[in-house]
Amino acid sequence: MSLNVVMGNGQHDLRSEMLTMIQQQFCQNELLTVFYIVPNHVKFDSEVNVLQRFSIMNGNDDSELYAQSRLQVYSLTRLAWALMKNTPDRQPDIVEPTGLFMIVSNILREQSDNLPVFSRMQTKSGFVSALVAQLVELRASNVTPENLLEVLEKSADNIFLRQTLNAKLHDLAIVADDFNARMGENQITGQETLIAFAKQLADLKLSNVAFYFDGFNGFTSAEMMVVNQLITTYPVTMGILGDPEKMGQQREGDVFFKPMTTVEQLSITARTAQQEVAITAATKMRPLSRTAQQVLGAWACLGEYRNFTGSRDEVHLNVFAAENPITEIKEVARRIRRSLVDDPTLHLRDIIILSRDLTPYQAHIEAVMSQFELPYFLDMDVNMMNHPLVELILNLLAPNKFQYQTMLAILKTGLLRPTFENKIVSHDEFFDIVSHMDNYLYAYRPYESRWRDFSRPFKLFQVTRDDDDTEISEDEKVNNRLEYLRHFIVEAFDELDDGFAMAKNLRQSVTHLVLWLQKYHVTDALLEQRDDFIAQGNLSRSQQSEEVWQMLTKTLDEMVEIDGERSVSLTDIVTTLQAGLSGAKFSGIPNNLDQLMISEAGIVQNTQYKQLYFIGGTRQNLPAQVKNAALINDAERSIVQPALQSGTNPRYLQNTAQQQMAEENLLFYGSLMSSIGSITLSYPILEPSGQLAEMSPFFKRLVDTFNSEVEVIGSIPSSAASLLKQYVGTARATLSDLVKILPVYGQTAAFKAVQNVISNTMQDRLERVLSAPNYQNNTTKLKPEFISALFGERLNVSISQLESYYSNPFAYFLQYGLKLQERATNELNVAQTGTLYHAVFENVLHELIVKNKSLRDITGDELRALVRQHMQSQLALPAFEILNDSGKMRATTNYLTRVCETLVLNLQAAARENTSKPEAVEQLFGFSKESLPPLSFARMQVRGKLDRFDKQDVNGEFGTIIDYKSNGKTFNWGQAYDGLQMQLLTYWDAAQQSAEKLGVAAIGGAFFAKISPEKTKITDKTDLNALFTGKLIPETFKYRGLFISEPAYVSALTTLEPQEKSAHYPVVLLKNGALGKIGVDAVDPDEFALLLQRNRENIITAGDLILSGYFPIMPVEGGLTYSPYLDIIRFDRALGDAYKVQSPADKNTIIKLLKGGQD
């Protein structure tokens, strides 16, 4: 028996050396079986390569099929399974992460009085998982807390560190002892599989076998135990990186320090077992290109900060710096496309893209590779926590399943679907109704009580049916399907919750969950998803459905086995499931045999690729900045590790961050080894964070050594010639770069040449894309047939619609022409509270009108009672049902009632200033026959509604219009002139033409009444003590608007003495008894006539423009502030869009304009 080590650098073909030795041994011993051990990650590729090369070595053609039973390729874990499969009764049970989490959680709960350190720490998120990981690491390293305490007692390191570690180890020892006792002899963690295998190897008697190890640079503690056991019993041969002439002289920081130290440790083991040790230098060379050979040779020196003395001739190390990560990955894809064209023998499977960290690229890889039509395999772990099944279960176990976000998360998994005729509803049909349910839930946000109140159906659409209707409308069908889905959800949730409530322990809870998933066809939906992915050719995604179900059931089984008889809460179940599934990963399966490999440098790769692209080589990423988050931190590890690693039985904890970073030079060397051909290094100049990035020092050493030119790749070609030379890829990818240089180089020959080639495959797309730079954000006039279809031949509009046209013409087209609307929402906002106040005021005043009373004629208490009465009647309506849904909303209702009382009392106070009396509320004009006539024009008529109409004096000489507003709106002369504020003037005009019907001779004024209280901010200059004690005096209510400056009307509004101002009306008398100007909303009758005429002209102009199809993108400044159409309008002043010029707000200036227009 012996330990044979074949040692060489990355230029040597260690595999060929060992296969030659195997061939010789086969000739010498016809009964010999060789177990060829490789790292697990490259097991399949290595098996194919080993057998192919061995076949050729034995004289077979490389195209012939070859089988060999005496040469078997395994990973260590597969070897353990192969050798131990015939002794299942001796194999310990493996406890999965879920079980470990439960065991440790139970220990912490039961031992809390004995764990002073851990009792404080376990309240921190993730502590239990960190403790589990630490216990697993100690067991896998064959180290106990007692071992660490012994080392600590002998240490002379930092006293404070020793004290803190001692306290931590004290608690860890208690937990570990209890943990080991509960695990017993027949249970192990997944990381201890190889340790168990190593122990059983001692009893295993194999004859005529030999073991070969290939591709390892070092071993974990568990792997080392297996290797040591094999060395003591069987012949072992190992191919490993290193320099045999420097054995024993290696130092930390050397590129080959780790593998050579590993050989040194194995040699001690072999000699202790009386085995021969032979370390030989490899002589066979890999078929490397000149570049790959010299780069490997250079890094062996440069990685140790030694000068490279080898030849630099004919080394073509490609290096480029890209503007950003997206440009970088696009450039790599472009170069790969070019390589495939230049070399017909090159396949995608011959190319690998590596990065130390793929995170900055992960979100862009799919889009870029699709654009360049490159099939690829992303060799990264995919976490099971993001799978729809896990998402479904965790949300089903959440306490508030009926909340909007949780409900949508459940429905959008597509796994919980109702059935129809014993079949689950199809995917498309289900998601169609889910989209409607989404709209309903978003609009109304129903509480759980509302979900369960089936007497109040879910209605997304309000449908009115005539008695003679025989067909159900589409809107009604949607409402019916919503109700069906609602009943299904409530029934399913209730059955789930009832089963959990009846369960007496964890076993019954888990059993109920699985049976519920089967009863409600979640398993069937999961199988349907799998089949759909198979049909799409996505084998990787299809297997995930099976893997996640297997992992879930395995996790649940583990939970029941360990703690099945204990009574647990749903919170405990969720926490345990999250712990068990958080580390679960899907096994990646390539969808194609020929595809590009994209992986990270920290993962073992095969060494047969013809091209290597190492991306993301910035100072920040390479060498990697490692952080250790283990329970025993790096400083504490540095105290105990030297003693653990010494002696004849060395043991190893996880390396510290510093030790891991010291191995980065070896990791980079292994990455360079993956290519036998070309090597391309790249990095982004700009990090995703926006910060400038520097080239990695690893890259820089190679670049400086070989004087490599660093090509700078911008996101935009610098010229047409540059496009032709550097940016040509697929037609689609090239087109995206072509359009970027169109404005400058569109007429050059190179540009035309590329354009002509693209036009052969995608002419329509080419024309559309190349026209993009000439795009102007302008609209064109609608065709007459479209105008007629959208607006009819004659307009029938409200004045607020015309105001919106002047504010933003294109938004008017979107809202009233195309009928585009935001998603409805039933949230309590300013608009909705304003509507509520408005409705209460209307009903209160209507009751007073019926009783022929005014606000002055009743007491404050009577008025409050009226407000409360009509508030209750409004709350019974569907529009305000949200205010009855919860205690919080009922408290809000009480607040709104008090506010409403205050506002009505404000109106009462103003009414006491004169003898006015409300005559009508919600007075319509331009609607039904009972309403007042509309304002009619040649091609349109204007309709509207007067919130309140008062008879201002007892003789009925004057009438006053009141319009309720949530904000403190005032009359703006400039906006009235521009058509932006036409409401008061139009209402005045409509009321004046129907003055006789309204019972007055003329309209004297129109005012805005603010019906929302002003909010006081803490930042406002105010008395904070009064604010916090509720004694802050509220603002004084005041009407603002416009009135005729006739003395009779002014006297009807208020009775004032000279130098006095009205408390509630915009009226001030000067010393001489005349009307003042500041704070007075008066207008001369002649000037008012001009203003009214301008208003009519604005109405006619707006109607003519609308019916001519003129909807320019020319909003007034502020017209886009609350617009829901910003994403459609795309207004951008930097790109030439302009606001409409507004007139000044000054009254005198506008009057001059009005008189000038008249002249």
From Swiss-Prot:
**EC class of the enzyme, as a word:** hydrolase
Q: Which InterPro entries match?
A: ADDB_N (IPR049035), DNA_helicase_suRexB (IPR014141), P-loop_NTPase (IPR027417), PDDEXK-like_dom_sf (IPR011604), PDDEXK_AddAB-type (IPR038726)
Recall the GO molecular function terms of this protein's record: 5'-3' exonuclease activity; ATP binding; double-stranded DNA binding; helicase activity; hydrolase activity, acting on acid anhydrides
Cofactor(s) needed, names only, are: Mg(2+)
* Keyword annotations of the record: ATP-binding, DNA damage, DNA repair, DNA-binding, Exonuclease, Helicase, Hydrolase, Nuclease, Nucleotide-binding
Q: Does the keyword DNA damage apply?
A: yes
Sorted alphabetically, the Gene Ontology BP terms of this entry are:
double-strand break repair via homologous recombination
Q: What is its EC number?
A: 3.1.-.-
Keyword Nucleus in the entry? The reply is no
Job description of the protein: The heterodimer acts as both an ATP-dependent DNA helicase and an ATP-dependent, dual-direction single-stranded exonuclease. Recognizes the chi site generating a DNA molecule suitable for the initiation of homologous recombination. This subunit has 5' -> 3' nuclease activity but not helicase activity.
Q: What else is known?
A: Despite having helicase-like domains, this subunit does not have helicase activity.
The UniProt entry's sequence similarity note says: Belongs to the helicase family. AddB/RexB type 2 subfamily.
Give the protein name, as stated in the record. ATP-dependent helicase/deoxyribonuclease subunit B
